Amino acid sequence: GSGKTEISKLIKKFISHKFGKTLIINGDDIRDIFDIKKYDREDRLKLGKKYTLLAKHITDQNINVIFAVAGLFDDLRKYNRKIINNYVEIFIKSDLARIVSHKKKPLYKKKNVGKIWGINLKPEFPKKPDITIENDFTIPLKRLANNLKKEIEKKFN
């Protein structure tokens, strides 16, 4: 809803050129591939740890991973930093009300009551992300992606 996947697609070529082979993994795609339907806190934590192990497995083969997921828990972010070399956390900050009003994702429909972070599940927003990009839906995603590229350049130069 915040633009994670689209921004990931827009920066992939830049990351590949600058840092080598790069793969985008979208959390929704992983859920679809493995038919994962549970969204409660416990299951999200378990899945998050699996995402981390998958990312580590790929990065250990010298392939960069852009993992487009909602990182909801401080414990998972700490785990990511501990397990993954060169881990960079990018927080796309968005207002939930705007996400819901702009998006037509099935997750935000009434049938999913009780499963939506920020509405029924309290997220733990990152306290110290490496990079923060604000998406208030007034700036085109292409420009946000360009801003992110500049921030990545600053971080690695």
Spans of features found by a protein language model:
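Conserved nucleotide-binding/hydrolysis micro-motifs of P-loop NTPases
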Residues: 29-31, 71-74, 93-98, 138-139
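Inter-motif core of Ras-like GTPase G domains
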Residues: 52-63
